[in-house]
Amino acid sequence: MPIINKTMLITYADSLGKNLKELNENIENYFGDAVGGVHLLPFFPSTGDRGFAPIDYHEVDSAFGDWDDVKCLGEKYYLMFDFMINHISRQSKYYKDYQEKHEASAYKDLFLNWDKFWPKNRPTQEDVDLIYKRKDRAPKQEIQFADGSVEHLWNTFGEEQIDLDVTKEVTMDFIRSTIENLAANGCDLIRLDAFAYAVKKLDTNDFFVEPEIWTLLDKVRDIAAVSGAEILPEIHEHYTIQFKIADHDYYVYDFALPMVTLYSLYSSKVDRLAKWLKMSPMKQFTTLDTHDGIGVVDVKDILTDEEITYTSNELYKVGANVNRKYSTAEYNNLDIYQINSTYYSALGDDDQKYFLARLIQAFAPGIPQVYYVGFLAGKNDLELLESTKEGRNINRHYYSSEEIAKEVKRPVVKALLNLFTYRNQSAAFDLDGRIEVETPNEATIVIERQNKDGSHIAKAEINLQDMTYRVTENDQTISFE
């Protein structure tokens, strides 16, 4: 199914019901026309990071179901799957074969060798400091071979996630076979997880290394195109990187919108939001929440450093059951630039403020992605957080089918479902159309979307001082109650 301009639900295979069958039933029964696509977070056998340390992309974790269940989902919704282009599990057959056979392994070039990467007498501390890291030490891991020798491999993320060498032909063959298999099983859009880390080059920070990163991106796009799929690079960094990618006619993420929207709702000032909406490309997926924390680094220079600090402080002040320690190493937080909270709790579990945040997202340029906890206006799950000591689990509640049936009766959830059903069905949100943004006063923003020929005009007038709104289409008032 081609990508369509309808809201994409982000979910794990076992977060809305116990498995893929229940997920399929629950989306159909409770979300209806509010959902047009599904980002199915990693459902492959994995040894860590909630699926992001995959063992084998050709299998579905049996706890979730099988490929028939995945294909069944794809009959009703366009689908996005994750491809961890930077790494694979050290429990994979590729790693084990390399460990057993060393230089005789067919996969010896699949992994990026840390020792061979550096010239003699390097890396120096200066070299290590230059690397854009996700940990406070050199991103390497020891590998002990069956022949008794010891070497080191690049290891950017968790201990289970061993980096691939994307410059080698064996790796490109692996990428090709993986993408072909994903597309054959219903994948329409391939999310390239942690894409900016994939290329490493001497005397750089090893993050979004140009021009090599463009060569890799184009190669992967060409591979996907053969199977009729498209790609979405996932990169958390300065917004100008997203704009560069958009200029090359790729889909991009809007990871800045979450913090810009929080700042606007906390401060009752719309100037930063208005400027951002005017700048944003149409060929993008918008987010307020994902399976990770709320990104801070993405909003630099859209908000000033003072405004970022203000927003972070307000989140901890007005947020419900939010604590700074939940985003620290004590709770296994890899990324100091993310805040762990559901978006609903970041707004103090306030129904009206939360609905306005989603209204802004619905009218923003691009296609909305809504995380499953966000669709159900979910609160911070402190029980799961404390039982696992995993900070991101505060926003990873497991909903039973019975819980979902109860949650969708809440007025705020009903309103959200009506909002995104409207967004999916209205012609005004044409990605080839236009957006106009006005700010009648400091606290009021008027966002107007119209289709290419101007026959459908939707307008949202939002006042962040008194937290009111009015939505019209072709001058007819639209209600979401």
UniProtKB/Swiss-Prot annotation:
- Matching Gene3D superfamilies: Glycosidases, Oligo-1,6-glucosidase, Domain 2
What does the entry give for GO biological process?
carbohydrate metabolic process
User: What are the GO cellular component annotations?
Assistant: cytoplasm
The record's InterPro entries line, in alphabetical order, gives: Glyco_hydro_13_cat_dom, Glycoside_hydrolase_SF, O16G_dom_2, Sucrose_GGa_phosphorylase-rel, Sucrose_phospho
Give the enzyme's EC designation: 2.4.1.7
Q: Name one GO molecular function term.
A: sucrose phosphorylase activity
**The organism's place on the tree of life at top rank:** Bacteria
Name the major location. cytoplasm
Q: What does this gene product do? A: Intracellular catabolism of sucrose. Being intracellular, probably not involved in synthesis of extracellular polysaccharides.
Q: What is this protein called?
A: Sucrose phosphorylase
The taxonomy runs: Bacteria, Bacillati, Bacillota, Bacilli, Lactobacillales
